[in-house]
Amino acid sequence: MAAAAEPGARAWLGGGSPRPGSPACSPVLGSGGRARPGPGPGPGPERAGVRAPGPAAAPGHSFRKVTLTKPTFCHLCSDFIWGLAGFLCDVCNFMSHEKCLKHVRIPCTSVAPSLVRVPVAHCFGPRGLHKRKFCAVCRKVLEAPALHCEVCELHLHPDCVPFACSDCRQCHQDGHQDHDTHHHHWREGNLPSGARCEVCRKTCGSSDVLAGVRCEWCGVQAHSLCSAALAPECGFGRLRSLVLPPACVRLLPGGFSKTQSFRIVEAAEPGEGGDGADGSAAVGPGRETQATPESGKQTLKIFDGDDAVRRSQFRLVTVSRLAGAEEVLEAALRAHHIPEDPGHLELCRLPPSSQACDAWAGGKAGSAVISEEGRSPGSGEATPEAWVIRALPRAQEVLKIYPGWLKVGVAYVSVRVTPKSTARSVVLEVLPLLGRQAESPESFQLVEVAMGCRHVQRTMLMDEQPLLDRLQDIRQMSVRQVSQTRFYVAESRDVAPHVSLFVGGLPPGLSPEEYSSLLHEAGATKATVVSVSHIYSSQGAVVLDVACFAEAERLYMLLKDMAVRGRLLTALVLPDLLHAKLPPDSCPLLVFVNPKSGGLKGRDLLCSFRKLLNPHQVFDLTNGGPLPGLHLFSQVPCFRVLVCGGDGTVGWVLGALEETRYRLACPEPSVAILPLGTGNDLGRVLRWGAGYSGEDPFSVLLSVDEADAVLMDRWTILLDAHEAGSAENDTADAEPPKIVQMSNYCGIGIDAELSLDFHQAREEEPGKFTSRLHNKGVYVRVGLQKISHSRSLHKQIRLQVERQEVELPSIEGLIFINIPSWGSGADLWGSDSDTRFEKPRMDDGLLEVVGVTGVVHMGQVQGGLRSGIRIAQGSYFRVTLLKATPVQVDGEPWVQAPGHMIISAAGPKVHMLRKAKQKPRRAGTTRDARADAAPAPESDPR
């Protein structure tokens, strides 16, 4: 038995360069890169040549010399390969100069799972087109719709997903291998072509091949060799004050998927990775479409164990009809990225009847085995079409046991298991090797971890579980699965199950007892393990503390699609924030994104911000609104907010902040805006622009970090329809009083009527309103229809300012403005000096009242030809509506019944963030490396 040293936080095969991900492995594994004889399935544009002896340092690669038939670039140095010869890995398609072979430290995909430091599953979004991106498994360019991880920069072909390893970013602590020191999380390739190495300052990116590495937390970029010269600890780069550190977030695994943990809307995908899940073939490592075999060759279906047969997932392998059994087996192992010794494996014939069945009892077809003496697929005779890879029985085996804690100087220890070895005997054997011999073995247990690309599953093994039988069972299901399975010796700590479940959409205004009773009726909650920890009565939401993982999962699945009293519920899993562990200078950013706002750019921004920050701090407003995020950050002593949406979205978030202010440890968080709507007047005033048009999301975050804090008035509007101004109105049918908050402006009359018509048109056909230009065109068309309309608004309303009656001129619209921007940037108040009024400011505690005479007047104001009719300025207003009249507040319109409207200041001013003025960059200065490397939205034409 042996112990493998762990140099620092990560170890790289042969030393030198990092495994993209979070590696912690042993240099001993470097010998896993064995040369496999025989030609592979062909690299596509290159022709197979003579195999050259590859360097032992190349981790897991199977290099052979090939003759190049088209321009090719080296995957290590990204330079052009001059001449006709290159070296290609038959498994992962890594291409290299001969001179670069001895420097290759990027591991082959066949051994990559064994190098991951902490296994973390990926979270894939829907398939999409990703321009100039490369697959992390086969290293080919992504041309057809492909998959990408929502949390990290992993891009994959759908049929390559089963061969990717679980090396996603670790965004929270889950009770397994928790640690406070954070290391770089390296991801290979897909860097901008102009990216520069942090160490040598030379270009390290490429648009031709998968080359270079980048930390997915701090954004530092480097050559794979140069990255070894960097300190292993990651400081989160320029965004360190905005990022929520993973060590400060705790979420215990309770059966929830990654998409559920990160509140990501799940997309239905056919099968795991789509690798032939519908019975279709998955092509070989080169991903070229399988053509008719050349004369003298044949194509075989190769299955990896019972699970692949049951799912009808196979790989196509083309071999010579004269190929021997060893050569065919080698080609099959390369196609399935299996790093095991071929001497321990065999190919068994799969009967045609078994291929058509949904389930197949493995081992029944073992009578037809490829052997050198017997018939093989290359014998030239009638041979079966499908074969399955099988493991030969073993009398003993060397097993790697990993410690379940990270603060130890070894990555793993190796023990020999025999038919008599059990989980308990292995624990007794490895504890002295890990320096824990003084502790009681009863407090430790063996844990099996299946490291799938989509799921990481942990299973506690029984003390009497025979390990050799367990390994054979795993190989029976899938030979490759053994390389994706680890065994950890972990302390048997009784971690109390705890899940925080946010439930929204409940009837507002109920008592705690009524909410508990309502939830018990809806979900049959168990009082012994479910309790209500927080109640937001005015918003109709509660937070449940669930002390049982199974009960939490049951409640989540039940409540998320349930309707109570005609209202659809929302159920979200929330982590716990360990605010005491936040760095002293940390002021994390809480991000709210409305994906439905103008142009539908919010979907791309959601993905970009999840990758640039911790996904736990990014919230989709269509999935529960702003309240879940505010509850999660309620104990954070200092944080900021970024709202991505239109003016209505900003008002929604500010209103939620107002209602929850007394619950927040940071009662006055500053709010920044990324304008996604049509008008975006508040965004204009605060210098965030007229609308988002594809700017670099990383640059947006930098601007938020550097923004200046300013104050802004908020106003409360009381709408009371009980006291109608007309005697013919029946108060019994009047609307109940309601209160709305206002930040920008409130319009009565013609402008609200135009907004209402636009709003109704968008609700009827929302798919057409995806362009800001189209939206403005609809406004123009609606305005032209109203150009001759006259309703003499001044005769239908009464206005009091500071309790004094104000006579209104002949107008069609009355507008109360709080900011110097209205109707997509128009200056309604005007810039002319007037001794009757003070110069308006957004924090002066005053509203300006302006009138417009009609659609033509509004058009002239927006064109800068005129200004509105100045009527009054004050802090308290009372408007009497004599008839039902269109009203809009911050772009949200409705028809208000006759009655009163009272507008007054709404308590303390809100803290907003105004974008700092751009400082001219001096000649010769370079951009921040992360700004070059930040992921642009997927729909960005860049």
From Swiss-Prot:
Q: Pathway, per UniProt?
A: Lipid metabolism; glycerolipid metabolism
* Motif LXXLL motif 1, residue range(s) on this chain: 555-559
Q: Which organism was this protein described from?
A: Homo sapiens
Q: What is the effect of changing residue 245 to A/L?
A: Decreased diacylglycerol kinase activity
Mutagenesis / variant outcome for changing residue 241 to T: No effect on diacylglycerol kinase activity
Taxonomic placement: Eukaryota, Metazoa, Chordata, Craniata, Vertebrata
Zinc fingers classed as Phorbol-ester/DAG-type: ranges: 60-108, 121-168, 183-234
Q: Give residue ranges for domain Ras-associating.
A: 395-494
- Protein's name in the database: Diacylglycerol kinase theta
UniProt biased composition (Basic residues): 911-924
Q: EC? A: 2.7.1.107, 2.7.1.93
Swiss-Prot/TrEMBL catalytic activity: a 1,2-diacyl-sn-glycerol + ATP = a 1,2-diacyl-sn-glycero-3-phosphate + ADP + H(+); a 1-O-alkyl-sn-glycerol + ATP = a 1-O-alkyl-sn-glycero-3-phosphate + ADP + H(+); 1-O-alkyl-2-acyl-sn-glycerol + ATP = 1-O-alkyl-2-acyl-sn-glycero-3-phosphate + ADP + H(+); 1,2-di-(9Z-octadecenoyl)-sn-glycerol + ATP = 1,2-di-(9Z-octadecenoyl)-sn-glycero-3-phosphate + ADP + H(+)
Give the location of motif LXXLL motif 2 in residue numbers. 574-578
Q: Which Gene3D superfamilies match?
A: 2.60.200.40, 3.30.60.20, Phosphatidylinositol 3-kinase Catalytic Subunit, Chain A, domain 1, Probable inorganic polyphosphate/atp-NAD kinase, domain 1
* Presence of the UniProt keyword Cell membrane in the record: yes
Q: Name one GO cellular component term.
A: vesicle membrane
Mind listing the UniProt keywords for this protein, alphabetically? ATP-binding, Cell membrane, Cytoplasm, Cytoskeleton, Kinase, Lipid metabolism, Membrane, Metal-binding, Nucleotide-binding, Nucleus, Phosphoprotein, Repeat, Synapse, Transferase, Zinc, Zinc-finger
